[in-house]
């Protein structure tokens, strides 16, 4: 079966996020009042697998081996 998988990767709490800092500064310059702001990367992948659990495991392996650095990133996986 084919499963649509969404992977969201973000920095762990306490990690510096210079992109978010620049965006927050730009928003303030444009007159927008913002509080906390963080960035994340979203990947949508179509995975062929036997079931939802296998698709989730494949996505986890993709994160661990390529997309995420476990020292600085956290990730979530959604399987449809």
PLM features per residue range, with description:
Residues 1-80:
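Long, contiguous binding/interaction regions
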